[in-house]
Amino acid sequence: MITSKQRSYLRTLSNTLQPIFQLGKAGIEENFLKQIVGALESRELIKIKVLNNSGMTAREASDIICEAINAEAVQTIGSKCVFYKTSLTKPKIELP
């Protein structure tokens, strides 16, 4: 669990990020989750865009993804979600 101060710090870091995944009509599948886990391990902070044809809102997708991979939802605005998970091998981001 991250504090509100840490969440605020992560939000500032995520402002310049571009979404690296798009969630479409295929939905949240096991392969999609594996790709997210790999990206979080290497980057620690990622942004995902939820397309209109996915059949779910960004908040719903964020809740499902966080529960499935034990990540922290930093922010959900519009159709974009930001996730954070500390890397087990090489932590890059040092939280305040």
Label for each model-derived stretch:
Residues M1-P96:
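Positively charged, polar, low-complexity stretches
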